[in-house]
Amino acid sequence: RTLHERWDETPLCGPNEHGDYCEDFFGGDLAGITEKLDYLASLHVTTLYLNPIFEAASNHRYDTADYETVDPLLGDEQDFRTLCTEAEKRGIRVMLDGVFNHTGAKSRYFNADGFYPAPGAAQGPISPYYSWYSFHPFPTDYDAWWGIKNLPAVNERNESYVNYIITGENSIVRRWLRAGASAWRL
């Protein structure tokens, strides 16, 4: 990750030494949004739509690494809760972006690079997440969003995946609604 000090610094153009794109970060966090709520309310803003806030390798965060963790560059769960509480006081709702048809290859669920200590789908059937993905054959080929291999597609009909994301008592959707989100963009 390249974290720039100022907004006018030149971003990296092209892949880094690992072949990854989108490694430039220009700051901005949940606490900063909270600080601007009075200004946003003065503009009659009623909804804040946040791009994905979950831990991810890229700056766009559509390659979710962990749905249970706010990306540390944005803050933490308490920062999110504070944002939602303070926004609600001003009549502003917070909408999260739910990227649930794929994860990042570098996620705790797929774990292509072995970064996480627990096995991901890339480590095979020993992983509780293996059935979330479709391999043809394992481990070299798998379904991916638009064929982009660092965005492995999930089987949205897999019962354990649906339970984890939507239907379970402590599902991701319910968890973040309880934390203060008002809506999801799917």
Regions found by a protein language model. Give the residues of each.
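Substrate-binding/active-site clefts of carbohydrate-active enzymes
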Residues: 1-46, 53-179
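Short catalytic-loop micro-motif centered on adjacent basic/acidic residues
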Residues: 95, 183-186
